[in-house]
């Protein structure tokens, strides 16, 4: 990406291809500077050669300019694109991919944590002498199972966004029809923020659920954590009445499993936040922090709607539809239960509503844990190579795999450093003796 300047007129940033190395000698081309950025944090992206790049003085031939939408003729004439919005495409492509890929990363973390917490036994439940798996405790289930539902939502909705973009590319790429591209651009902007935040916090939650072993690089969490068409927004129609929302009729926890109730709560939440954002903007207040809550609330509604659409598209005879329905309910209740920031709880719920929501949430958590969790995780079919974790091996327990990894560590074969360590220890002892002697002399 570089600024295009023709006859001292700046036409803004454009895309170019630049040859970095000589194909015969592998030496850098004149004017190119490349620097390797060093080790990667948390063992992530180790196979990617990230670096810094500078072009202090490089001439780029005209034929190395990406010229599908904009051209520079041989006489220097600039031919602008038919529509500037087509430049969204590269960003939309990357964000559409991220919306799904982050979901797979979170699923891997959940699978590893599930394997470990179902193996790890600690403490006995009342009236039972046998130790219980850590997964049986609510403190673990309430952390992992909502993440399983959210990761599934990220995958299925991310796939829908990517399909919508592929369909747009096939039909309208060479036309002036951009309304759908603008919509996809906005969707992928929100999806990127929503999916990366949920995945980032989710992977860390899975790591913490594995206790001390989650800190080990052998667990794989560090690597996972560092690598992760929808309809128009119907909540906009709610905005007109955001300041005086209609009462929500909930008589029992089961009412919260109805989509009309879920849709009302999520739409009303977004509408209220939009109204607040407009008022704050008009008053000149800094909305950068509150805008994030609005983005996440909007993401809740979009992913909720997309998840249920994906469930509805599953044929009724498919065996996995029941599990997907329950996961969709768990996702719905989880996003209604947890506010993204403290200042923005669900504004439309009364105390009685919240009590019903908690009871419904508890019931769905138990149902997923006892009937669906293992089948869903197994259905994703992650291989040991994909998980790359000592905590999720089929032929070894987590403790055996961790010990095996410890025995293979290069640090076990550092005999060539032992003499240096001994000499260093002697130097420190001598320094301590010298300090003690100097102290005695000063007293005398």
Regions found by a protein language model. Name each.
Residues 1-444:
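Flavin-dependent oxidoreductase catalytic core characteristic
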């Amino acid at each position: 990406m570089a600024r295009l300047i023709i006859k001292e007129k700046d036409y803004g940033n454009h895309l170019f291809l630049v040859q970095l190395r000589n194909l015969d000698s592998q030496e850098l081309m004149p004017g190119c500077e490349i620097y390797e950025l060093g080790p990667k944090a948390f063992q992530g992206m180790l196979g990617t050669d990230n670096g810094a790049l500078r072009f202090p003085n490089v001439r780029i031939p005209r034929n190395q300019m990406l010229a599908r939408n904009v051209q520079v003729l041989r006489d220097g004439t600039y031919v602008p694109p038919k529509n500037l919005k087509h430049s969204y495409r590269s960003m939309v492509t990357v964000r559409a991919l991220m919306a799904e890929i982050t979901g797979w990363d979170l699923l891997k973390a959940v699978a590893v944590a599930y394997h470990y917490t179902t193996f790890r036994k600690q403490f006995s439940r009342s009236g039972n002498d046998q130790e219980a798996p850590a997964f049986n405790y609510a403190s673990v289930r309430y952390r992992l199972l909502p993440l399983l539902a959210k990761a599934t939502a990220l995958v299925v909705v991310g796939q829908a966004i990517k399909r919508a973009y592929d369909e747009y590319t096939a039909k309208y790429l060479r036309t002036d029809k951009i309304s759908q591209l603008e919509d996809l651009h906005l969707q992928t902007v929100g999806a990127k923020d929503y999916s990366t935040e949920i995945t980032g916090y989710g992977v860390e939650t899975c790591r913490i659920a594995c206790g001390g072993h989650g800190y080990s690089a052998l667990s794989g969490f560090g690597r996972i954590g560092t690598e992760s068409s929808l309809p128009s927004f119907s909540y906009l129609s709610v905005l007109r009445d955001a300041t005086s929302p209609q009462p929500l009729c909930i008589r029992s926890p089961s009412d919260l499993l109805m989509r009309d109730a879920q849709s009302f709560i999520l739409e009303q939440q977004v509408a209220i936040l939009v109204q607040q954002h407009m008022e704050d903007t008009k008053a000149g207040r800094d909305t950068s922090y509150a805008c994030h809550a609005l983005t996440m609330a909007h993401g809740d509604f979009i992913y909720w709607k997309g998840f249920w659409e994906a469930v509805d598209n599953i044929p009724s005879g498919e065996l996995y539809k029941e599990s997907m329905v329950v996961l969709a309910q768990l996702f719905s209740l989880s996003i209604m239960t947890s506010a993204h920031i403290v200042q923005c709880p669900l504004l439309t719920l009364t105390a009685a509503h919240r009590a019903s929501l908690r009871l419904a949430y508890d019931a769905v958590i138990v149902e997923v844990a006892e009937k669906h969790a293992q089948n869903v995780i197994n259905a994703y079919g992650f291989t040991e190579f994909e998980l790359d974790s000592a905590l999720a091996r089929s032929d070894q327990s987590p403790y055996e795999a961790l010990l095996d990894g410890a025995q293979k560590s290069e640090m076990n074969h550092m005999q060539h450093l032992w003499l240096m360590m001994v000499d260093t220890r002697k130097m420190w002892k001598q320094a301590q003796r010298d300090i003690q002697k100097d102290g005695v002399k000063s007293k005398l």
